[in-house]
Amino acid sequence: MSFKNLVPVITIDGPSGVGKSSVCKVISKKLQWNVLESGWIYRVLAFIIFKNNVCFSSRNLNILFKNINLHDFIQRINFKNYVISQSLFTNISQEYIGNLASRLACIPYIRHFLLFQQRSFRKFPGLIANGRDMGTVVFPDAIIKFFLISDFKTRVARRCLEYEKKGINSCNYKKIFYDMKTRDQRDHNRKISPLIPAKNAILIDSTYMSLKQVSNVLLSYILKMQKFKL
């Protein structure tokens, strides 16, 4: 076993709007662990592609990768304390960037390219990894794997509320409904790393639960492991 693999990982997977990011932040604060928001990595890459008006082709994307140091850029984002410029955060939070990120996630060599970037966040004392394939592909040896689900309309409403609170000017219910539906279909049906629970994942339905309730449920499972004492 390598030194890196001695670092414990807890994964939280699920579709958008189920509360992964918020729960991830609560759990990481309780455990004082590092955080990986894998969706942000795809969104940052999607924003760079959008900003540079790069067409979707292997040649164009490869040229872009050679001209940017994505690894260094990603490492400068402190997920644990959510340190990221407000302008960049607002840009990558837009739903159209999320959809572009979802399209990128369907490209095999993009996923392979970003696999190392994601695994590089595995550092002591531990890592809370949030995404769509954290427990199935990126960290299959995670000590605990959670998969959050929620009613679709509840997820859309949560996303609208999130945008309103953050002052993001793309809070159109019908558009968000359509975009999330499209993204769900793409995430579930892609051939590479589809959005599915790991075989040993713990499924949590957050439809009628508050952030505090969901966080407490996850923490109760975590605390059952003797090594964790808060």
From Swiss-Prot:
GO terms for cellular component: cytoplasm. The lineage of its organism: Bacteria, Pseudomonadati, Pseudomonadota, Gammaproteobacteria, Enterobacterales. HAMAP family: Cytidyl_kinase_type1 (MF_00238). GO terms for molecular function: ATP binding; CMP kinase activity; dCMP kinase activity. It comes from the Bacteria. Pfam families: Cytidylate_kin (PF02224). This is Cytidylate kinase. The gene is cmk. Its EC number is 2.7.4.25. Transmembrane segments: none annotated. It is an enzyme of class 2 (transferase). One of its GO terms (biological process) is pyrimidine nucleotide metabolic process.
